[in-house]
């Protein structure tokens, strides 16, 4: 017999401490010797001392995993050598197997340092069969349960085949040796047969094909130990339904419970009478306290809805199921939604049941949890179109439309997909003119496009894909179907949606140019093989890829995708991509190229990269405007009676074609002229406008004589819109003699009558585009406009419509309409004459007229009898043309500061529509970079607007600008703070800032801070506010209000930074303030005195702290309540309120007149103490040199308002 030679101490003690490394070394030596010994030759007594040492707590429960692993390896070797009698007591074996179970969990991580030792432990337990020692332990059943649980956990998470084999062998050994298999172990075992992954995979999927390793392990156990398990399986099926519920928890059900419900489903389908005493118990399960129980019951009953009629056979169970739609658990609500629609597939379902289910789905579209909303949308998407038509209402579908603007991205994406699918199914009804379907579904494309205002790139991309593939079906080879879908959608577009659609078409040109340049770079790059200029070519390719990536929601993926495409150097793919956006391509060529391109690149690009590539191809492809479509549009316009349903959409598309693709329009311009000639005086303004747009973009363009004669008639006797477009075409294309003849005809017949507005519209265009010919009669026209129109007043005061605040332009009385158009003619003369020698002499009285209109509230009549609507329109017109002149640097230099203040107060006009329309115009001009930076502060005056719509509109736009400038690292919006403080210091209410109006000025500044300032730019803004206190006001010397506002802004920034944890670090750079309004204080002592002085009162500080800590909505009420004189959208003030408002305004005017007696006799409505002071704001970007009517054109930059929000 061979004795164990190892005699060294392996147990650390207080007297004989051992380091961890020393213990590991000795254990390795011991393990090596034990492994080399044979069971037949070992002297059993020689290993007993080592056995006693190995079960010492200092080794078996050592904190080091390596020591525990090697200790257990030694122990299992001892079990091998001493088998069948273990050299350990039962208590020691119990401790050993507890540690073994813990250490075996390490089999999940094959990268573990001690994985080989753990593997050896498992292997020895299997081969030596030492695991059967567990059955002799007092708590053998508990050990068996833990082993089942551990091994199946390991199997689910993935192990090697050898590990699975050893685990199978060990479990089989235990099953065959133990006296009684515990129920808990059987529960674990049965659960694996179902799938072991949760209710969704288990209920109703007893023969699932998705069998993982855990299932395989369980199946093999049943196969190898079938005789032993047979009795337990029978007993389980007999007792499970009645005995298992007491062991259920709120978060987890037992596998037996799940399996029993699968059994119920099978019996319900094939033998429902066997469940007469079981199904009623589902009522209790559906209302059980445990969430897990309710989940299983909900899914079980939901799946049962597919067969038979549970609502009639078991009405109480059906009622309990419907009640789970409002379950407190999100998971239960989702499950109920997902399975409730099964009732709609059951032929036994009555109309009452179907209606009930539909109402259940509708109600969950507004659930408080996003997961529930997503689940509802997915479920609805799966319903048939007939179900929608028969059971859903327009209001229910509009609730789905509301989810397009959901705060959560996942909900928006699912709503986009669902609504697109619904519209696609409804198309045939819509094209057939089914009225009910039109009411139900026609709004969907419009709502989808309006999603662009959510300002999320991922959402935008989803809309574009769904519009292209489902709504408009751009990939359809049938031109007529494709156009019908396009016209049908446009027919029901809202104004917002139409604007987005046109901007998307406009953006297509940008993307096609970008991809065209990208392809050129790819060709030069030649897959990385270049002979010359390698660095330059590579840099160009990198730059264009960076630009493309910046327009994606996933720049990293986009960069990798287009880099991969370039490296492939597939010349055929380059050709196909070019053909998708070539204006020479027929649509069939475009379609064929797209399909071929996608098929070709799918072989090399991943699925994610292909999706990324697809969206850019869709954005650049000529889907809407291509040669095939344009010829079809012209054909449609030639037969208006036949195609009357799609006449307006086709006209709308044709109107924008010359703006976006003038070359394509040029091929059909003769056909457009023929349409105008054939229609005569009834010509559609949109068709004429399209020709007008083309004439402004096409050099040396001329029209046919017959077309010119028709346009001439329209200039004299058409509608205003017809005259406007016709006059533009004539001014650009016709001969000097033709234009002079028409001008003479108009001027000789100028008189105030019902036809004057049309002639004034014509004159306005002629002054703008052909000033040289009109200038000879300009003074005569101006005299007529001033004396016979502008100075023409109502004969008597008409109080009939005294309460009316607004009306559309078309409903204006003739006199007001003529005055508006007269102002337009005068301003257009100035716009055309900009830079000329006489421009200032001509412009001075016109600019003065605009200013007087603003100061006088639009009232020019000495009898004060101008109707409210007329005054409102005149104020709006004056402000609108002031902005036009400010966008021209030549005139901007000569518009004084007091006029600027007057313009700013339009944001606080008493009329809601004036404020709203002026704000829209202001935003557009700023968006196009046509106004100086000093006009940004006007937007923040909406902070105290009583109408939430105005404030929201301004807030959204400001935030979009902030986001845009941050992308380009532009500090424009931060610099605006200086202009805002300066403007507020000249606000008419500034004199009462220390009393009743302090909250207003806090609101202005807080509005700026809330919309512009963040943790990154707060140091810059704070620095600017401090710099203001080192400067003096150029406009009004001694203006200390600017310092009060500076301190107020600093305090607001400090309080907000403290509340939000922002760091107010010192800004390291020195920023120059705008020199035209603020200049450094020359005296050092004076500068120091002002800088150190606190200009705000303790009361103001308290108000600021309270304001910042108060929700915006609550604080807004405190400010807007004081502005009740501002007319809200749908609210009319009482007569007493109006009188009070007039008194306040008159008092304000009196005070301002006292400050500047030079203008006392001039009618005004706000501060004028800065009259005559001119400020040069020409450093800001201004309009292009080309003269154009902004309302006629859509600039390419317009898309930034949506794309860069």
From Swiss-Prot:
Residues 1111-1205 are annotated as: Disordered. One of its GO terms (cellular component) is nuclear chromosome. Keywords: Cell cycle, Cell division, Centromere, Chromosome, Mitosis, Nucleus. Residues 1111-1123 have a biased composition (Polar residues). It is found in: Nucleus; Chromosome, Centromere. GO terms for biological process: attachment of meiotic spindle microtubules to meiosis II kinetochore; cell division; DNA repair; mitotic sister chromatid cohesion. One of its GO terms (molecular function) is chromatin-protein adaptor activity. Residues 1186-1205 have a biased composition (Acidic residues). Gene3D superfamilies: Leucine-rich Repeat Variant. Signal peptide: none annotated. Residues 1124-1133, 1140-1151 have a biased composition (Basic residues). Required for the establishment and maintenance of sister chromatid cohesion during S phase. Prevents their formation until eso1 is present. May also have a role during meiosis. Interacts with eso1 and hrk1. Associates with sor1. This is Sister chromatid cohesion protein pds5. It comes from Schizosaccharomyces pombe (strain 972 / ATCC 24843). The gene is pds5.
